[in-house]
């Protein structure tokens, strides 16, 4: 069996400028634990997971915001709405990158190895630079359960 046999084809993805608040709502609504972040051509550029939503400390967020405020405010008039938006992180701010991906022909054994080696829970399936599916650990477990029992010799 390969990725194409077990992958979820209806992939929920987000753009890099999607606010994290919207991503959190999407994860809850769709009952998923992570989404690929795609560029304008549909190519994966990162992943955002539940861990990214809760794993960043307040100090990290404040340090990032302070850096941007200092950089932008030095001698330049800055749009107040833009400054306010800096307190709302986007997918670009929080995603894990670069994205690790596979193709449709990747075997289930290889996928399991990739998930284990990189300590990730899902991997996008890419064809011609675009996401065509996603394989999660749950997909691998379903495939394992669906296999016919082979009696011991």
Predicted regions and their residues:
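Tandem CBS (Cystathionine beta-synthase) repeat/Bateman regulatory domains
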Residues: 1-153
């Amino acid at each position: 069996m390969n990725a194409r046999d077990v992958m979820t084809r209806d992939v929920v993805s987000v753009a890099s400028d999607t606010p994290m608040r919207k991503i959190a709502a999407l994860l809850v609504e769709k009952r998923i634990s992570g989404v690929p972040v795609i560029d304008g051509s549909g190519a994966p550029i990162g992943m955002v997971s539940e861990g990214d939503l809760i794993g960043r400390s307040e100090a990290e967020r404040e340090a990032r915001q302070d850096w941007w405020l200092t950089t932008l405010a030095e001698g330049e008039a800055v749009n107040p709405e833009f400054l306010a938006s800096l307190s709302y992180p986007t997918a670009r701010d929080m995603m894990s990158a670069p994205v690790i991906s596979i193709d449709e022909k990747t075997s289930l054994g290889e996928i399991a190895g990739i998930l284990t080696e990189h300590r990730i829970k899902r991997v996008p399936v890419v064809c011609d630079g675009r996401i065509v599916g996603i394989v999660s650990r749950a997909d691998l477990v379903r495939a394992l359960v669906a296999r016919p029992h082979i009696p011991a010799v």
